[in-house]
Regions:
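Conserved nucleotide-sugar donor-binding catalytic segment
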Residues: 14-16, 131, 149-228, 232
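Glycine-rich, basic loop-to-helix element that forms the pyrophosphate-binding segment
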Residues: 76-93
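Short alpha-helix within the catalytic core of nucleotide-sugar-dependent glycosyltransferases
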Residues: 29, 33-34, 58, 87, ...
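Active-site acidic Asp-centered loop
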Residues: 51, 101-103
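Short aromatic/hydrophobic "clamp" motif used to bind/position activated sugar donors
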Residues: 98
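Acidic donor-binding segment of Leloir-type glycosyltransferases
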Residues: 33-77
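Conserved donor NDP-sugar-binding/catalytic core segment of glycosyltransferases
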Residues: 106, 111-143
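Short, well-formed alpha-helical segments that are part of the catalytic scaffolds
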Residues: 21-38
Length: 241
């Protein structure tokens, strides 16, 4: 093993927050890592912050540990808080470019890393990138609903025309993080803050990732959704007023 002091930092870091996902977390992560395995761009690390209480995710990570550089961190802090878990994964990344990916999503394009890295690293005027995404309800057998992220004037009201954080990549020197007080609008708040702090992203209008629509997703299991949306919208507006 190469000592950390001598290790060459990767060009791209993939930040993946994980949890047990009602017992399906390891299978979902397996699907994602298989789409990582076939990426044309190989100069990357995978960073996993795991909120699971069992060992299934860690065991799955070990299966792939000889294929690529993986950092696994068992995170017991604020267990169940998705923004906190994602922030922890980001904090452990060392790459020039940090790519966020949720464990229930996966890469649609085997050149995704290459396209993200060269477009973002090659533009000194931009700090972040939003890529296109599609959706699946049957584990990738069929794909539908392409989204090419754009901002709108009602973003803080919960009108999300950007999609999930799996469409986001940003440069290492970006300090904006996810607000750990939020649940439903954690992504929207981040996008708004990024644009306010770092300006417009690169809008990369090519579908690079797939968002999985399923009953076990975090957004599908939010109770009192309308009340939560209203309260979080007020919180975000006051925050940026």
């Amino acid at each position: 093993m190469i000592p950390l002091s001598l290790r060459i930092m990767p060009r791209l870091s993939l930040a993946i927050p994980t949890c047990d996902y009602h017992g399906k977390g390891d299978a979902l992560l397996d699907d994602l890592l298989r789409t990582v395995q076939i990426q044309s761009f190989k100069d990357f690390e995978i960073v996993i912050s795991d909120h699971s209480e069992d060992d299934k995710i860690e065991t799955k990570v070990q299966e792939f540990s000889e294929l690529f550089d993986v950092k696994y961190h068992r995170n017991s802090n604020k267990r169940g808080n998705s923004p906190a878990n994602l922030n922890k994964a980001i904090s452990l990344c060392t790459g020039e470019i940090i790519k966020i990916m949720f464990q229930d999503d996966f890469f649609y394009d085997d050149e995704a890393f290459e396209k993200i890295y060269y477009n973002l690293a090659g533009d000194v005027s931009k700090s972040w990138l939003l890529c296109g995404t599609n959706h699946t309800q049957d584990d990738g057998h069929n794909f539908f609903w392409d989204i090419f992220p754009r901002f709108n004037d009602n973003l803080l009201d919960g009108v999300n025309t950007i999609s999930s954080p799996s469409v986001v990549a940003f440069k290492k020197d970006v300090l904006v993080r996810f607000d750990e007080e939020l649940i439903y609008l954690m992504d929207i708040d981040f996008y708004y803050n990024m644009r306010k702090t770092h300006g417009e992203p690169i809008y990369y209008d090519d579908v690079l990732v797939t968002n999985r629509i399923h009953q076990d997703s975090i957004s599908s299991n939010i109770t009192n959704r309308e009340e939560l949306l209203q309260n979080e919208s007020i919180y975000c507006k006051q925050k940026y007023d």
